């Protein structure tokens, strides 16, 4: 923030003295971070809506398609593939609600100056910023927005990543040669291996599994 202000000051001249008046770096950084998290969360909500739409459609399509149910990876009792997809659908419905709650939790701003006392800035400035950015004001004045808000937001991302991984691992298991109950989409000219052209590897599911672990970490 200091480097940014210095750069602006060199170009704006004497009026630059008002640019950061009464604020701290935390006012700028915490508020801008929360804006980014809110906007990112809305992108994820749209993605989850697409996932829900597809899972619902496919669950209905395959509601009478029999497959074997497994526990501990071992054949148990018959189920339908639609039931399996319906389970994924309900899980992502819960994830959507969690994400909505997380976005609401992180939608706050703080423009209250050093240690949050408004000593050198009018509280109306904070109200104006909150209204402009569609954020809420922190209920208790503070310099640093409490990190439990961020912890909740990122824990929800970890849960969503876990759900994505659960679907991906299921696809990987069902695509194994000795199982061969399910396959990722494989285009006509797609190659599975440079050395073994007969292979159809679940690359997308493998990538999703790896990315989910990175999110949780």
Language-model segment annotations:
Residues 21-24, 130, 164, 172:
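Generic secretory/membrane-interface signal
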Residues 80, 113, 141, 155, ...:
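Conserved short-loop catalytic and cofactor-binding motifs
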Residues 126-143, 147:
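Active-site-adjacent "gating/activation" loops or surface patches in catalytic cores
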């Amino acid at each position: 923030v200091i480097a940014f202000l210095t750069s602006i000051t060199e170009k704006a001249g004497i009026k630059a003295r008002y640019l950061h008046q009464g604020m701290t770096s935390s006012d700028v950084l915490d508020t801008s971070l929360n804006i980014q998290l809110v906007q990112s969360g809305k992108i994820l909500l749209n993605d989850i809506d697409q996932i829900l739409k597809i899972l619902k459609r496919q669950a209905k399509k395959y509601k009478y398609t029999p497959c074997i149910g497994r526990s501990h990876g071992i054949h148990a009792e018959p189920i339908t593939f639609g039931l399996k997809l319906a389970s994924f659908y309900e899980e992502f419905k819960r994830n959507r609600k969690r994400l909505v709650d997380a976005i609401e939790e992180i939608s706050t701003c703080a423009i209250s100056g050093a240690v949050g006392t408004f000593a050198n800035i009018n509280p109306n400035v904070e109200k104006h910023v909150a209204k402009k950015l569609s954020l809420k004001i922190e209920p208790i004045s503070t310099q640093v927005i409490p990190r439990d808000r961020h912890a909740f937001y990122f824990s929800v991302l970890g849960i969503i990543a876990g759900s994505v991984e659960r679907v991906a691992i299921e696809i990987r298991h069902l695509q194994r040669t000795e199982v061969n109950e399910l396959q990722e989409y494989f285009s006509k000219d797609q190659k599975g291996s440079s050395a073994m052209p007969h292979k159809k590897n679940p690359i997308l599911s493998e990538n999703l599994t790896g990315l989910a672990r990175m999110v949780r970490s």
